UniProtKB/Swiss-Prot annotation:
Pfam families: UPRTase (PF14681). 5-phospho-alpha-D-ribose 1-diphosphate binds at residues 79, 104, 131-139, 200. Catalyzes the conversion of uracil and 5-phospho-alpha-D-ribose 1-diphosphate (PRPP) to UMP and diphosphate. Allosterically activated by GTP. This is Uracil phosphoribosyltransferase.
């Protein structure tokens, strides 16, 4: 069963409060999402492997540690997931970036893949799939399906806010993918919005309706 990690770092929780606030404008919203993504990336990369190397300081040669050849990839779910990418790349600039685009079929209400672009060495990379919201879980499940059928084997999912229903759906379909979130909210309402949530992340990020 996939593990769920809720980050309770004070800075993450502080910034998340203003992300939720209906009075937060588009520019500030984008900046806050970027900042929280950086803080979450710091937490999610705690287990990266290290190897010891020699480094020449101005005084003498010393033993020190560097990341041990780990290949990472960041995959935002379009469009709202794009707002989290730069925050992660600030910490791991060598990561390759893929994209997964999905839309909801008006008849079946199920997510449909319309765009996928991943690094060519997909089987060798560990991916962090990002989306600000995990509501019903439908889009996240389909995005992970897209990665796996193209050869991805090591995947983590990172979002700002999740509903219990979305977490359950993810664990049902992708029990091998751990979930990293800033807050686990109460529930979904009848329209599928997370309660209390933050509204529509994409609309608030890009100033659309």
């Amino acid at each position: 069963m996939a593990k769920v990690y809720v980050f309770d770092h004070p800075l993450i929780q502080h910034k998340l409060t203003y992300i939720r606030d209906v009075h937060t404008g588009t520019k500030e919203f984008r900046e806050l999402v970027d900042e929280v993504a950086t803080l979450m990336a710091f937490e999610i990369t705690r287990d990266l492997p290290l190897e010891e190397v020699d480094v020449e300081t101005p005084v003498q040669v010393a033993k020190s540690n560097v990341i041990s050849g780990k290949k990472l990839g960041v995959v935002p779910i379009l469009r709202a997931g794009l707002g989290m990418v730069d925050g992660i790349l600030k910490l791991i600039p060598a990561a390759k970036v893929g994209h997964v685009g999905l839309y909801r079929d008006p008849k079946t209400l199920k997510p449909v893949e319309y765009y996928v672009k991943l690094p060519s060495d997909v089987e060798e990379r560990e991916f962090i799939v990002v989306d600000p919201m995990l509501a019903t879980g439908g889009s996240a499940v389909e995005a992970l399906n897209s990665l796996k059928k193209r050869g991805a084997k090591n995947i983590r999912f990172m979002c700002l806010i999740a509903a219990p229903e979305g977490v359950e759906e993810m664990q049902k379909h992708h029990p091998d993918v751990d979930i990293y979130i800033a807050a686990l909210d109460e529930k979904l309402n009848e329209k599928g919005y997370i309660i209390p949530g933050l509204g529509d992340a994409g609309d608030r990020m890009y100033g659309t309706k």
